[in-house]
UniProtKB/Swiss-Prot annotation:
UniProt similarity note: Belongs to the intron maturase 2 family. MatK subfamily.
Keywords per UniProt: Chloroplast, mRNA processing, Plastid, RNA-binding, tRNA processing
Coiled-coil features, chain-numbered ranges: none
Molecular function as annotated in GO: RNA binding
Protein name: Maturase K
Annotated organism of origin: Allamanda cathartica
Top-level taxon: Eukaryota
Subcellular location field: Plastid, Chloroplast
GO biological process: mRNA processing; RNA splicing; tRNA processing
Length: 505
């Protein structure tokens, strides 16, 4: 703190330009750590009143677009190697200001090494770097400093939705969204290697993570650019296709047509375009690309699920995510993704050499421990997986109880239908089946054995073992001269939370 006070005593103009990003830094940390806005977190910033916190945030967002204002620029070192002044403020320079704000808590000139170590070891800390992931290309050394800090990076749209309730000011929020989207689009255009561009639009009433609450087409384009911020090339045609898919009634044919319309722009970038539109708690995923790119359609669907679940899967930084066994928590369900390597040997002629082709298959597993933990929280079983009766449903009719248990079981089997190993899924079905039997036996005040003997075992097989008809996703080979259909196993995203089903009255 003494070093900070020493820097603030240099010059009055320098004090203003230095105080400005410090205030901005504090509130960004407040947004990331879910603290109240009238609470100092890292630095005691002089020169403002805590009671005027909301006004300060509004003024900061508004003055970002005002010219002739002092802003910190890391490239301009005419006055000081650490501080610079730039009078002409444009949208492309906002990223420099954000980058310098990130530099402040990591600078050894301002914060001592012990305080810095304490900040880095904070388990709840989500740095500014995670809120603005498009700054990863500007400072490469953040990959080494912040590897442990970011288990769950914050999605830009989630930040905007949080600011929307705090600021109560639509124009300033649109200014901030335009600034962040412009910098994100510039960073995405600078990336040479283009990955799969995924645009996710979720319903506001559901428990989805990313919610696009913009009516204008430009706001929808900004949401699409934010969703594909992880080294993806988002073209204007792809954004228009995403807006058209969101405007439609989320029909599978309409989504496929939208993906086919964007296939021309996606083929130029040599990447598959995946569009996921969610409406009425049902999501339809469609992808159209070349035959070689269609083989990785499962990976593209995983990228769309990652964008919807606000998890950024960076190709070089997957190890940063502190998730147990590479599991992915998506809308209340758990999924474990694994690459199964296999070897295919081929021989063209009888005396020719054997050719080894290594194949990595994208497969999903049924995670037993997270699912049993989720079922135990919903009071279907205990922590050891032993089924228990659901006392809250004893007042319902028998058909209603069986319908609710059967719906959960069908959703689970439908969600994990792409998994190759179904043994764990059958154990989960057994837990739900016996929990339903115990609930019905408790309602009729009898034992489970007597209740099953009176009704018969086929009584439960009718609604628990019969699964819904599955949807087969086929991908046409657009660029191949041989027209055909490529079918691949895929897991489904049209699922409902266990807790929502368990808490229905």
């Amino acid at each position: 703190m003494e070093a900070i006070q020493r820097y603030l005593q240099f010059d009055r103009s320098q004090q203003l330009s230095f105080l400005y990003p410090l205030i901005f830094q504090e509130y960004i940390y407040a947004f990331a750590r879910d603290h109240s806005l009238n609470r100092a977190i890292l630095l005691e910033n002089p020169g403002y009143d805590n009671k005027s916190s909301f006004l300060i945030v509004k003024r900061l967002i508004t003055r970002m677009y005002q010219q002739n204002h002092f802003i910190i620029s890391a490239n301009d070192s005419s006055q000081n190697p650490f501080f610079g002044r730039n009078k002409n403020l444009y949208s492309k320079m906002i990223s420099e200001g954000f980058s310098f704000i990130i530099e402040i808590p990591l600078s050894t000139r301002l914060i001592s090494s012990e305080e810095l170590k304490g900040i880095l070891k904070s388990p709840n800390l989500r740095s500014i770097h995670s809120i603005f992931p498009f700054l990863e290309d500007n400072f490469s050394h953040f990959h080494f400093v912040l590897d442990i800090l970011i288990p769950h990076p914050v999605h830009l749209e989630i930040l905007f939705q949080t600011l929307r309730y705090w600021l109560k000011d639509a124009p300033s929020l649109h200014l901030l969204r335009x600034x962040x989207x412009x910098x994100x689009x510039x960073x995405x255009x600078x990336x040479x290697x283009x990955x799969x561009x995924x645009x996710x639009x979720x319903x506001x009433x559901x428990x989805x993570x990313x919610x696009x609450x913009x009516x204008x087409x430009x706001x929808x384009x900004x949401x699409x650019x934010x969703x594909x911020x992880x080294x993806x090339x988002x073209x204007x045609x792809x954004x228009x296709x995403x807006x058209x898919x969101x405007x439609x009634x989320x029909x599978x044919x309409x989504x496929x047509x939208x993906x086919x319309x964007x296939x021309x722009x996606x083929x130029x970038x040599x990447x598959x375009x995946x569009x996921x539109x969610x409406x009425x708690x049902x999501x339809x995923x469609x992808x159209x690309x070349x035959x070689x790119x269609x083989x990785x359609x499962x990976x593209x669907x995983x990228x769309x699920x990652x964008x919807x679940x606000x998890l950024w899967f960076h190709s070089e930084r997957v190890y940063i995510k502190q998730l147990s066994n590479h599991s992915l928590d998506f809308m209340g369900y758990f999924s474990i993704v694994r690459l199964n390597p296999s070897m295919v040997r081929s021989q063209m002629l009888e005396n020719x050499f054997l050719i080894n082709n290594a194949i990595k298959k994208f497969d999903t597993l049924v995670p037993m421990i997270p699912l049993i933990g989720s079922l135990s929280k919903a009071k279907f079983c205990n922590l050891f997986g032993h089924p228990i009766s659901k006392s809250a449903r004893t007042d319902l009719s028998d058909s209603d109880i069986m319908d609710r248990f059967g719906r959960i079981c069908r959703n689970l089997s439908h969600y994990h239908s792409g998994s190759s190993k179904k043994k764990s899924l059958y154990r989960i079905k057994y837990i739900l089946r016996l929990s339903c039997a115990k609930t019905l036996a408790r309602k009729h005040k009898s034992t489970v054995r007597a209740f099953l003997k009176r009704l018969g075992s086929e009584f439960f097989e009718e609604f628990l073992m019969s699964e819904e008809e599955t949807l087969c996703l086929t991908f046409p080979r657009v660029s191949s001269p041989f027209w055909g259909v490529y079918g691949s196993r895929i897991w489904y995203l049209d699922i409902t939370c266990i807790n929502d089903l368990a808490n229905q009255q």
